[in-house]
């Protein structure tokens, strides 16, 4: 856990307190239901990884002021808005260990409050006074939406390649990690070389994070991952462990995985889970995540050595610790 690492023990509480202060103020609205739902999902916590990356990227290039924490909150609002929308699309009933907003308040309210958080994020962006930051975030949110549609198109797709899978997760998940790091670098007036390094770092950390998330759907517990295990299979999502089995498993395993994905039924989970854990699907997936982490760390080589750089390396490694 990040809070057990020395740098984060010293700085994380204060940094997150500043971000949460912005979030708690910005989530308020004269429309009571917006404040109620917004506060509900924000107060569920979460790891705040993306805001932390924004803060670290800014500090890595020598920048630390109130605008940095406002941008970090903006990134969290973008993330939270996508969660609200995702839970409606996926018909999820559990998020971060609690009932989803759509489960409690209905789909319409969840979607509309997601829209509110999304537009509030853009108001926070404007406060940065940087057209480049607006440009980066406009591009990122567009690509994230494309990634979500790509994922939707691949529901039940048993012919998906590993390359296509990586493209989907880099669009829908890693792109926001990339943007989170890049806006911190831009605010800190980083050199082009350092901005690119931090941008790459975010992309690779985000890629590793999503692969591990997909691994945990077969190796984690509901209490640990904050959602129902087996959700991906129940939704017909061909994640990396399943793609590996379809390409490298026995004929019986491959056929059963294809059948389970095409029918998107949780009743198949126990059988598919047994195939996954008794094969190399999870070790292979974890090794691919480790490759992404190694690339994230290598991308920081151009930055001068510092306590913040060390913290970013620790954060990248921490994405793998969830399955160790």
Locations of the language-model features?
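All-alpha prenyltransferase/terpene-synthase fold signal
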Residues: 1-324
């Amino acid at each position: 856990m990040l809070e057990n690492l020395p740098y984060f023990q010293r700085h994380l509480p204060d940094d997150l307190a500043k971000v949460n202060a912005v979030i708690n103020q910005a989530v308020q609205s004269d429309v009571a239901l917006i404040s109620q739902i917004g506060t509900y999902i924000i107060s569920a916590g979460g790891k705040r990884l993306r805001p932390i990356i924004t803060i670290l990227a800014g500090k890595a290039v020598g920048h630390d002021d109130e605008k940095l924490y406002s941008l970090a909150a903006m990134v969290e609002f973008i993330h939270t808005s996508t969660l609200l929308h995702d839970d409606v699309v996926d018909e999820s009933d559990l998020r971060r260990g609690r009932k989803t907003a759509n489960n409690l308040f209905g789909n319409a309210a969840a979607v509309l409050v997601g829209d509110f958080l999304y537009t509030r994020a853009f108001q926070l962006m404007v406060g940065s006074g940087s057209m480049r930051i607006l440009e980066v975030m406009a591009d990122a949110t567009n690509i994230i939406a494309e990634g979500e549609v790509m994922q939707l198109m691949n529901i039940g797709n048993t012919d998906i390649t590993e390359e296509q899978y990586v493209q989907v997760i880099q669009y829908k998940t890693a792109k926001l990690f990339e943007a989170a790091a890049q806006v911190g670098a831009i605010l800190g007036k980083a050199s082009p070389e350092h901005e690119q390094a931090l941008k790459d770092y975010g992309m690779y950390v985000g890629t590793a994070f999503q692969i591990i998330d997909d691994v945990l759907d077969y190796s984690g517990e509901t209490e640990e991952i904050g959602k129902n295990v087996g959700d991906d299979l129940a939704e017909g999502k061909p994640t990396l462990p399943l793609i590996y089995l379809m390409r490298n498993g026995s004929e019986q395993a491959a056929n059963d995985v294809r059948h389970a994905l095409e029918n998107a039924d949780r009743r198949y989970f126990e059988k598919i889970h047994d195939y996954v854990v008794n094969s190399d699907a999870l070790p292979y997936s974890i090794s691919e995540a480790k490759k992404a982490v190694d690339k994230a760390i290598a991308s920081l080589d151009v930055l001068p050595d510092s306590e913040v750089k060390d913290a970013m390396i620790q954060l990248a490694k921490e994405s793998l610790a969830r399955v160790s």
